[in-house]
């Protein structure tokens, strides 16, 4: 069995009894290639794409980053559930969900800039570092946070000064 392009190829050789093959120079055994999708534990199929190794980004307050469809790509904090809108993948300095990247809207660098999901461009406003359980924008040097000191379900996720209480601390699960 070999793994190739997200599919498993199984090569079967028919025995000499079934195909009349011999080992003394006559025709070699036949091969049949069968392809079928491989489903892994962390794989989610939705809209034709897969999220591999997807994880929740949880606050220390027990809420999760959520990019639900009713939020128009804006991230908010929601009760943690195992739903696609709360699963993110980590690729070096990018955080993605499907084909979209975590993005400081409008290439913003100021406190209060909304965090959204946006088509991946490779710009620095889509690059993130982790430091002391915080997620910090490479371009802005600001952390993911909220506009209020008291974190509540439904709060929008924005850029916040990393040294103040509006910056959120996260665990990845």
From Swiss-Prot:
Keywords: Cell membrane, Lipoprotein, Membrane, Palmitate, Signal. Its main location: membrane. A lipid is attached at residue 21 (S-diacylglycerol cysteine). Gene3D superfamilies: 2.80.10.50. InterPro entries: Ricin_B-like_lectins, Ricin_B_lectin. Pfam families: Ricin_B_lectin (PF00652). It is found in: Cell membrane. SUPFAM superfamilies: Ricin B-like lectins (SSF50370). It is a lipid-anchor. Coiled coil: none annotated. A lipid is attached at residue 21 (N-palmitoyl cysteine). GO terms for cellular component: plasma membrane. Residues 1-20 form the signal peptide. This is Probable lipoprotein EnvE.
């Amino acid at each position: 069995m070999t793994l190739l392009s997200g599919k498993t190829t199984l090569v079967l050789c028919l025995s000499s009894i079934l195909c009349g093959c011999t080992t003394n120079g006559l025709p070699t055994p036949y091969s049949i290639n069968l392809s079928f999708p491989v489903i892994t534990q962390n794989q989610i199929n939705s809209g034709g794409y897969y999220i591999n190794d997807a994880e929740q980004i949880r606050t220390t307050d027990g809420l999760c980053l959520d990019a639900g469809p009713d939020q128009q790509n804006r991230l908010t904090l929601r009760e943690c559930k195992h739903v696609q809108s709360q699963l993110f993948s980590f690729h070096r300095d990018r955080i993605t969900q499907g084909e979209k990247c975590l993005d400081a809207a409008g290439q913003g660098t100021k406190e209060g800039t909304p965090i959204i999901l946006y088509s991946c461009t490779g710009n620095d406003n889509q690059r993130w570092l982790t430091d002391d359980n915080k997620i910090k924008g490479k371009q802005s040097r600001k952390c993911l946070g909220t506009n209020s000191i008291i974190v509540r379900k439904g709060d929008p996720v924005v850029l916040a000064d990393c040294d103040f209480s509006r910056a959120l601390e996260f665990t990845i699960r």
